[in-house]
Amino acid sequence: MADKEATVYVIDLGESMADCHNGRNESDLEFGMRYIWDKITTTVAASRKTWNVGVVGLNTDETNNNENREEYQGYENISVLQELGPMTMASLRALKSKIEPSSTSSADAISAIVVALRMIQTFTKKLKYKRKIIVVTNGESPIDDDQSEEVANMLNDVGIELIVLGVDFDDAEYGFKEEDKPRHKEQNEKILKTLVDHCESGAFGTMAQAVEELATPRIKSVRPFKAYDGPLTLGDPQKYPSALSIQVERYFKTKRATPPSASNVANPNGPPQTQVWNEDDGVPFSGVGLQPVKQLRTYRIEDSKAAGGKKDVDMEDLAKAYQYGRTVVPFGKSEEDYLKYETTKSFTIIGFVPMSSYEPFLNMGETGLIVAQKVNEEAELGLSALIHALHELESYAVARYVNKDKAPPQILLLKPNPAIEDDIECLYDIPLPFAEDVRSYQFPPLDKVLTITGNVLTEHRLLPNNDLQQAMSDYVDAMDLTEYGQDDDGHPAEYAPIDDLYNPVIHHMNQAIRNRAVNPDAPLPPVAEILTRFTHPPEPLLAKAKTEIDGLIQAAEVKKVPPKVQGKRGRKDTVKPLSGLDIDALLSETRPRTKKTPIISTENAIPEFKQILETAEDDETIEIAAKQMGNIICKLVSDSFADVLYPRAAENLRVMREELINMEVPTLYNKYITKLKESLLSGNLNGDRREMWFRWIVGGRLGLITQDESEVSEVSENEAKAFLK
């Protein structure tokens, strides 16, 4: 069952809360509300029906609370701004309009706590709830401490946690002390501190620390989710009585975190409607003037007799189909059911591997935790024996796992818990790849060069010499982060520990959503420093390692890359010499320039084609290069046995298309692709080559270059679509 929470925020809206103190450019109320809004918007984002929020205003101009005392004696200027209940965007915006400084500062903070206490008592009764009261004040209004001990006892009896956060309150642990503090404020701080100390569950602190900690991402804690409950077997217990069978339970140990997903909404002209929801779905998405967008998909076929030339087709009349070459092969539901791999729920050990032979890069996903079935001593004994055996033999188990009937099987690696000496006996499981998921690539060796003749070279311009290796070793040692950080006692510790590394995409997205919920017209906040502090090497360490960096640059003979300047055609970038001299002009003075016709080879067509266009100085050179590339594509198609060379021809065509778009000469490509289509469909390229057109050119979107892709093109989008039919 989901956790139930009841939290009441007591917010000081007194006249003094409108003032700015200690060099801040925001009022005490705005400063304190940064914490309140963050907490409330987190509750709204969770969309949990069982998380209830109430708000009590302290030092309000009016008095409106639930105390049935004559003229609210002792509870003046205390108002309930929001009754306890689920928090929605509508109630959030309604609450925001009520948070304004008042013109009074005479209400008693302890009386406001009593109002919040009775709100929680009335709402939660004696049910199981997490009860909490959070007080935000600057301590300027008078406080009567005559009944503080009695109030603390009431809080303890109900089981309420009291948190008091004061604006500019002294906090020795945080290291803050307000200078020239008014005497009455100092006395009020002591009263509130004493009240918190008398509570069995409470906290007292300064608002500066609370606001500072808002930037630290809060890791979501979740309840253990049982993914499997059944036998873990070794062998087939139904066939062999000696087979091993242990009743186990499997839970998720780690789960991939994802950023919140967005949905399409609309601002309708009619009255807003509330989306239907149930108890498990959370609060309704309503009250903000937006409605979710519903998608409607229809299927149509051409029919000259129907209105508009098209007729709607029912879903019952449709069948899935797969493309096989240029042929569409339909598959009915019966064929799909026949092709499904039938599985039954099972968890079976299929083998064992030594720990030393397992490579960590084979880990494929989220980790699971396997423990013995609860209240089953036989299962506990059996699993314990298996875990100890794996430890002693330094082995891992490999298991086939199907969490439910007809689910796809997984291969899991079962690792015994390394902390077995702490009486924590469990197995960790990690998904393994199947054979077709593993790609083996051959790379040239890093310590030698193999020549074409078979010679082995240990000294080569592509291999590091001893000086370079030593310089790199010194640089790595100088940039060592293992002891660059500090622990709480100031001793050397690891820099950027894993517990301090947060995903900036996920947490900044959450922070931005919370900010936009409260301030829809304000700009988005910058990325919190805690999310980016480890994205770059620390500057002091870089300065300290400058000598090693300079030595590495010298040993590696690192040279500055010449800047690129705009070429003569205004389309491509050309390299400008560091000297600034015109090399072509200097060479033309010593020897006459002869124009060479560029030649592109079939074996190295793409790099040579790009190189020619990179240095092209006139349209004639570009036309020659495009013509040669086109001839190579036609030759590949013509020489292809079946479709063997089609992928290579399509890749050449794709590069040709992209480069001619960049060179702003789409006409060359459009003329060529028109002729190529005619040749492919007419059989002029050594047989039936229509598959090259339909699968690789039409399917690869390598048709005419349109005006959207190149401003100088004269082909419209409709013409390009018609060309591909």
Swiss-Prot record:
The lineage of its organism: Eukaryota, Fungi, Dikarya, Ascomycota, Pezizomycotina. Pfam families: Ku (PF02735), Ku_N (PF03731), Ku_PK_bind (PF08785). Single-stranded DNA-dependent ATP-dependent helicase. Involved in non-homologous end joining (NHEJ) DNA double strand break repair. DNA-binding is sequence-independent but has a high affinity to nicks in double-stranded DNA and to the ends of duplex DNA. Binds to naturally occurring chromosomal ends, and therefore provides chromosomal end protection. Required also for telomere recombination to repair telomeric ends in the absence of telomerase. ku70, of the ku70/ku80 heterodimer, binds to the stem loop of tlc1, the RNA component of telomerase. Involved in telomere maintenance. It is found in: Nucleus; Chromosome, Telomere. Residues 232-478 form the Ku domain. Heterodimer of mus-51/ku70 and mus-52/ku80. It comes from the Eukaryota. One of its GO terms (molecular function) is telomeric DNA binding. Keywords: ATP-binding, Chromosome, DNA damage, DNA recombination, DNA repair, DNA-binding, Helicase, Hydrolase, Nucleotide-binding, Nucleus, Telomere. The keyword Ubl conjugation does not apply. One of its GO terms (cellular component) is Ku70:Ku80 complex. It catalyses: ATP + H2O = ADP + phosphate + H(+). Belongs to the ku80 family. Its EC number is 3.6.4.12. This is ATP-dependent DNA helicase II subunit 2. GO terms for biological process: DNA recombination; double-strand break repair via nonhomologous end joining; telomere maintenance.
